[in-house]
């Protein structure tokens, strides 16, 4: 009887471990920013989820492929008069994807190099990256 309980316990622990590992699987997030069209598309595991208007830099936003370096939900710029940068996803030094109060300028270059989004879209993106992980997120800017 004791042996049966031991086997049952081992099976239960193995099943729990498999479910835990399966539940911990995170999705791959791809954020693509098209500077010529001032648009961002977001895909999760290869499935298109969102297309949003953005504002990139007037004098340029770095092009390339990046991974998020840090997240800051309520960030204020240390470079530009403490400008609010809600839902910041930093990807290249001081460059970030973040919400903006200048929503009327979305769709055209307007920033000093960052990628600006409508605050509600920035919140959705921030939560997605936070949930799925910075290591599972890739940002391409072209």
Locations of regions flagged by a protein language model:
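Bacterial N-terminal signal peptides that target proteins for export
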Residues: 1-12
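Bacterial N-terminal signal peptides
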Residues: 11-20
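Sec/Tat signal peptide C-region and signal peptidase I cleavage site
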Residues: 21-27
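Short Pro/Gly-enriched beta-strand edge/turn motifs at strand-loop
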Residues: 23, 69-71
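Exported/periplasmic cell-wall-interacting domains
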Residues: 28, 60-65, 72-142
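A short beta-strand micro-motif
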Residues: 30-34
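N-terminal targeting signals for Sec/Tat export/insertion, comprising classic cleavable signal peptides
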Residues: 35-65, 127-128, 133
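Beta-strand residues in well-ordered beta-sheet regions across diverse protein folds
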Residues: 41-43, 69, 98
